[in-house]
Amino acid sequence: MKLLLAGLLLAGCALAETWSYWIEPCTAELAKQSGCTSADAELGVWALEAWQKASAGELRVAAASEEDRARIRIYWAWGTQSLYGEARSIVVDGRRGAAIFVIPDMARLGPDIDAVAKRDPLFRDTVVYLTCVHESGHAIGLPHTAQFADIMYSFGFGGDIVEYFGRYRRALASRQSIPDHSGISPADRDKLVAIFKK
């Protein structure tokens, strides 16, 4: 019986689509330019693992040995004010992927976000984490939505953006509780599973 269960588990793993990833190390020079921290890579990993958990066994994420082998690549960027992140399509070994650019410097995201982040470092981690989740959702194939509850909500629809992040922040007891709160809504989850059922 144990062998049968083990076989079924292995078969389930084999059916999952693997998405390899690579996350840019935050060097001292990059930290000065972008505002990243060495701990931000962990937020990126948690974001990808959140999609894995939400996929009902359809998606598996795994670290790539090299940047150019990764289907999802996360970079710490700096640039246009109020642009939280961006996902640009790439093709890796004939398979769809994305280069993701995340802005970790709260000062570039406007005075309201910056003011809260300065008072509360965990709010800053919330913004970086949820941006990683949102942009990696695009990488996997999820579009924007107009529903404020969704991680794939587009800020182009307006709303209280500080509160968008604030409601998530209030669910956290500490940074280490982030993996327990994916930020992914039931509607996001349904759309994710539908992608892999096609």
Regions found by a protein language model. Name each.
Residues 3-12:
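Sec-dependent N-terminal signal peptides
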Residues 12-16, 64:
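Short boundary motifs at domain starts and secondary-structure transition points
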Residues 16-21, 72, 150:
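Hydrophobic beta-strand segments of well-ordered beta-sheets in folded domains
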Residues 17-45:
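Fold-level signature of zinc-dependent metallopeptidase catalytic domains
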Residues 40-147, 157:
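Metzincin-family zinc-dependent endopeptidase catalytic domain
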Residues 98-119, 127, 143-198:
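Metalloprotease/metallohydrolase-associated module, dominated by Zn2+-dependent proteases
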